[in-house]
Every structure is written in structure tokens, then in C-alpha cells.
UniProtKB/Swiss-Prot annotation:
Annotated Pfam families: tRNA_SAD (PF07973)
PTM annotation (Phosphoserine): residues: 174
GO cellular component: a single term: cytoplasm
The keyword Flavoprotein belongs to this UniProt entry's keyword annotation: no
Residues binding Zn(2+), per UniProt: 109, 113, 209, 213
Top-level taxon of the source organism: Eukaryota
Entry keyword Protein biosynthesis: yes
Note on how the cofactor is bound: Binds 1 zinc ion per subunit.
Protein name (record): Alanyl-tRNA editing protein Aarsd1
Task performed by this protein: Functions in trans to edit the amino acid moiety from incorrectly charged tRNA(Ala).
Gene transcribed to yield this protein: AARSD1
Source species taxonomy: Eukaryota, Metazoa, Chordata, Craniata, Vertebrata
Cofactor (UniProt): Zn(2+)
Record localization: Cytoplasm
Organism per entry: Bos taurus (Bovine)
């Protein structure tokens, strides 16, 4: 038996009766990947206006007596409606469909049928699957390549048929009807029961389908094929929009074009060239900046070596463009194995820099005999850190430094580096290093 939504895709509300209501759970996944389990009820109605997911088409949204329906799934000849409020069996209820979502799905699904038929008719390109996405839809074609000329020809043809206002009819055929063998289709579900539903675009295509469709191609308004992408092995994905999605896409594209025109100070026809020039300038600036940072790293390393406090524990604190300020901790005479160290040095902070910047400093100073704690990034936020020095000390201190800075890192061969989220706790790391040295001295 076809549901009301399949018999009349344009119906927006109707009255029916609750058959059953049982406790259930709904597993959801947000766009950010977060998963959630909702407690609620599966409600079965005598008939439904809400389409259950199937045939590549997502399910409808809507309400039952103003209670939101969060999911609709098919179970044999019945449709389960998930709600978070129970409904009493035998109660007469009013069902309303989210018409914007429904009509969008009708446009995309009928658009897919049309593109599939035309691609096959013009070039023998067979559709193997399709997906009705939230923003765009994808048709998988059984061909390793589809040329730009073929795409343009398909787009011209489908829009001509839309302008011809071709009717779209829905019929039901029995399983033993000879016509079943002549219609396009990818098989029936294992639990299918009853007649076969066939959607026909007059003079274009007949296709087995359970989905909701427009009654005339004119309701598609327009189809825009955005292009193709490489699909699975020997397959090509054709990306398209139909109907209102094309209008939204044009509105969004025009808004972006206006914004770029204002930012780039040129007309739309010059946007690409203007961006290329900006990219080239940016690459040159990045290259120059990298060279300057490398030179600065060498300069800082030499400045440390030449510091009057060399032999004690010193720090360099620099917030970016300002002058560096040096502070001496306390000169220490380190016993073996630390007596071989010429310095225990903490280069506390520089806002600008990267991992390479810190490693150049470590290489120039020579971390085999010097314990270095280097950081770059936001003084009170996130950044990068490097602990370098004798392997035994770094192996012991590295994970503890990472923990204090609430970061993640790894180390080998006398270097431990990583990302930190709490650069404001650098002073605690300095204290940790001092305590470690003091403890080693006491043990000696």
C-alpha cells in the first residue's frame, strides 16, 4: 500500500488515526560529529503524510498534533514516526509536513530522474547510485570520465524538457505486469510488499521509485550541473542542483561576488587575477619572513651565548616587535652529571615563530650541554614549546612540561616538542626545571 505522501506529494496536512505507540530510542549525529541518543516513542499511524527514508531520498520532517517528528523510517508496510511525546492509540490526529523540506526533496529527486534518463539517452551513461545531500546532490555515473562537453549537453537537454512542461505521472503495477521489465530500476527491497510504484516523465523515462515527485517538470524551474568529481573505481560523480537550490546558490554566489569586489577593488571579471597577485605577494612575504626568523633565531642563540649571565640560568622574554629583556635566574654550580653542562637556559617566550625557529636556536646553542625551554605563540593562550638538552633530563622533564602547559607532545634524542594550550603557565615550567636541577644537585 502506498502512503498518502506517495499518492499525493503536494498534500501538506491531513487527518489520520494513531495505531500504536511504543518506547524507543533515536541515535543522532550532529554536523560536528557529536553523537546523541534521544529517548522517545515510535508512533505508527493508519496512513502518513510524512515520507519515510528510502530510494536515496531522506525522510520528511513535520508534526503530529503539533508534536515534532524527528525521524520517519519504513518498517515493511508501516512507517515509524519518532517523537519525544507519546500519542494515545485510537486518537485522531492532524499531520502536517515541513513543506519547504518536502518540496526541496521533490525537486531534487525528480531532477535526478531527469538527468539520469538524459545522460543515458545522449551518451549511454548509466546511473549506479545517487545521494540527495543537504546542500547538493550527487549522481554516480558508470564511467571513469565525463567530458565538459557532455555535461553541457546534458544540462541543455534537461532544461529544455523543463521548459517543455512535461508531465510526471505515478502508476502502480503488479509484480507480474510485463511492463515492469521495461522500466528503469535497481531492484526492490527484500521486505517489499504489494504493487510496484513507477514514476514516468512523459516521453522521457519510466522508473521504479518510492519517493515523492513533482507532477510536472515545470515545477523544477531549472537544473544547474555544477560539474563532476572522481568517484569510486571507474565511476564519475555528477554534482547538481535543482529548483530553489539554484536560486539559493545564485544568491549566495552573488553575495560572495559583491564582497570580493569590495575587498579586491575590482570587477568580478578580474577577481581571479587579483587573487593570484595577492597569493604571489603573500608567498614572497612568507618566504622573506621565514628567512628573517631564521636569521633572528641565529642572532638570539649567539646573544644567549654572549650573555654576561652565561653559566647561570637566564631567560629571554619578548612579546613580538619590542626589545628583548634578559633576566638572570641564579648562577648555579652544577655537580656531575650536570657539571658538564655549560648552561641551563630558558628562552621563555616569543609571539612570532614556529617549530623550525625554536630548533634553529637549539642547534646553534648546542643542547647537548644546555637545557633549553623555548616557546612561541600567544602569551596567555596556545602555542608551541620545545625542551632540548641532555637526553636523560629531557626524557624525564618532557612529559611533565607538556602536562603543566596542558598540551601534547613527543620526544626523542634529547628533544621534546609539542603544542600547548596554557602558555600562561610558562613560569611553572621554569620552576619545574629549577626544582629538577636542585634535586639533582642535592642527590650528588
Amino acid at each position: 500500500m502506498a502512503f498518502r505522501c506517495q499518492r499525493d506529494s503536494y498534500a501538506r496536512e491531513f487527518t489520520t488515526t494513531v495505531v500504536s505507540c511504543r518506547p524507543a530510542e533515536l541515535h543522532t549525529e550532529e554536523s560536528n560529529g557529536k553523537k546523541e541518543v534521544l529517548s522517545g516513542f515510535q508512533v505508527v499511524l493508519e496512513d502518513t503524510l510524512l515520507f519515510p527514508e528510502g530510494g536515496g531520498q531522506p525522510d520528511d520532517r513535520g508534526t503530529i498534533n503539533d508534536i515534532s517528528v524527528l525521524r520517519v523510517t519504513r518498517r515493511g508496510t508501516q512507517a515509524d514516526h519518532f517523537t519525544q511525546t507519546p500519542l494515545t492509540p485510537g486518537t485522531e490526529v492532524q499531520v502536517r509536513v515541513d513543506w519547504e523540506r518536502r518540496f526541496d526533496h521533490m525537486q531534487q529527486h525528480s531532477g535526478q530522474h531527469l538527468i539520469t534518463a538524459v545522460a543515458d539517452d545522449l551518451f549511454g551513461l548509466k546511473t549506479t547510485s545517487w545521494e540527495l545531500g543537504r546542500l547538493r546532490s550527487v549522481i554516480e555515473l558508470d564511467s571513469p570520465t565525463v567530458t565538459a562537453e557532455q555535461v553541457a549537453a546534458i544540462e541543455r537537454s534537461v532544461n529544455e524538457k523543463i521548459r517543455d512542461r512535461l508531465p510526471v505521472n505515478v502508476r502502480e503495477l503488479s509484480l507480474d505486469d510485463p511492463e515492469v521489465e521495461q522500466v528503469r530500476g535497481r531492484g526492490l527491497p527484500d521486505d517489499h510488499a504489494g504493487p510496484i510504484r513507477v514514476v514516468t516523465i512523459e516521453s522521457v523515462d519510466s522508473n521504479m521509485c518510492c519517493g515523492t515527485h513533482v507532477s510536472n517538470l515545470s515545477d523544477l524551474q531549472v537544473i544547474k550541473i555544477l560539474g563532476t568529481e572522481k568517484g569510486k573505481k571507474n565511476k564519475t560523480n555528477l554534482i547538481f542542483l535543482a529548483g530553489n537550490r539554484v536560486l539559493k546558490w545564485m544568491e549566495r554566489s552573488h553575495g560572495i561576488e559583491k564582497a570580493l569586489t569590495a575587498l579586491l577593488k575590482c570587477g568580478a571579471e578580474d577577481h581571479v587575477e587579483a587573487v593570484k597577485k595577492l597569493q604571489n605577494s603573500s608567498k614572497l612575504l612568507q618566504k622573506n619572513n621565514l628567512n628573517l626568523l631564521r636569521d633572528l633565531a641565529v642572532h638570539i642563540a649567539h646573544s644567549l651565548r654572549n650573555s654576561p649571565d652565561w653559566g647561570g640560568v637566564i631567560t629571554l622574554h619578548r612579546k613580538g616587535g619590542g626589545e628583548a629583556s634578559w633576566r638572570s635566574w641564579a648562577a648555579c654550580n652544577f655537580p656531575a652529571p650536570f657539571a658538564a653542562w655549560s648552561q641551563v637556559c630558558a628562552l621563555c617566550f616569543r609571539k612570532d615563530g614556529d617549530s623550525e625557529f625554536m630548533n634553529i636556536i637549539a642547534n646553534e646553542i648546542g643542547s647537548e650541554e644546555t637545557l633549553l625551554f623555548l616557546t612561541v605563540g600567544d602569551e596567555k593562550g596556545a602555542g608551541l614549546f620545545l625542551l632540548a638538552g641532555p637526553a636523560e633530563a629531557v626524557e624525564t622533564l618532557g612529559p611533565r612540561v607538556s602536562e603543566v602547559l596542558e598540551g601534547k607532545g613527543a620526544g626523542k634524542k634529547g628533544r621534546f616538542q609539542g603544542k600547548a594550550t596554557k602558555m600562561s603557565r610558562r613560569a611553572e615550567v621554569q620552576a619545574l626545571l629549577q626544582d629538577y636541577i636542585s634535586t639533582q644537585s642535592a642527590e650528588e
